[in-house]
A protein has these predicted regions:
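Flexible coil segments in periplasmic/lumen-exposed cytochrome c-class electron-transfer proteins
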Residues: 118, 130-135
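C-terminal motif of bacterial Sec signal peptides marking the signal peptidase cleavage site
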Residues: 16-19
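Solvent-exposed helix-loop boundary motif
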Residues: 21-118, 122
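Bacterial N-terminal signal peptides that target proteins for export
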Residues: 1-10
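Positively charged, low-complexity intrinsically disordered regions
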Residues: 7-8, 55, 130
Length: 135
């Protein structure tokens, strides 16, 4: 096989792989994280909705989900010495309980019946790493 043909095939293969990684082009903003990942996977599955809030975790609305996960109302600045939320430590996905739950590390994986794809977990992780902003 001529060298130029091999080079073209290799470039085509690499381009195809790059196109398959749709995670990088999906936003890591709170609106997307809640509406596209948490709400359909956690709240509408009747586990963490307003009517069936397991462990007092209501993820059904953007406001309630943010308050539960981060520990403050969206838009309110953190107060000095304020404890962080039960699930998210902004800027620190490696020590955020939400990441342990989504990956099933040291605990039962969430959601238990249909774990999130790695790409969606990566988006949540990126959101936390970026400081878990709500806007």
């Amino acid at each position: 096989m001529p060298l130029s043909l091999r080079r073209c095939l290799a470039l085509g293969f690499v381009a195809t792989l790059a196109a398959c990684d749709a995670t990088s082009d999906r936003p890591s903003e709170w609106g997307y994280v809640h509406a596209a990942i948490l709400e359909p996977s956690c709240a509408t599955a009747l586990c963490h909705s307003k009517s069936a809030s397991r462990a007092a975790v209501d993820l059904s609305t953007s406001a309630s989900a943010y308050a539960v996960l981060v520990g403050r109302v969206c838009g309110a600045p953190p107060l000095p010495g304020e404890p962080v939320g039960n699930f998210v430590r902004p800027g620190h996905p490696e020590s955020s309980r939400l990441m342990y739950l989504l990956r099933g590390e040291r605990t039962t994986i969430m959601p238990p019946d249909a774990p999130l794809p790695d790409g969606e977990i990566a988006i949540v992780e990126r959101w936390i790493l970026e400081g878990a902003p709500c806007e």
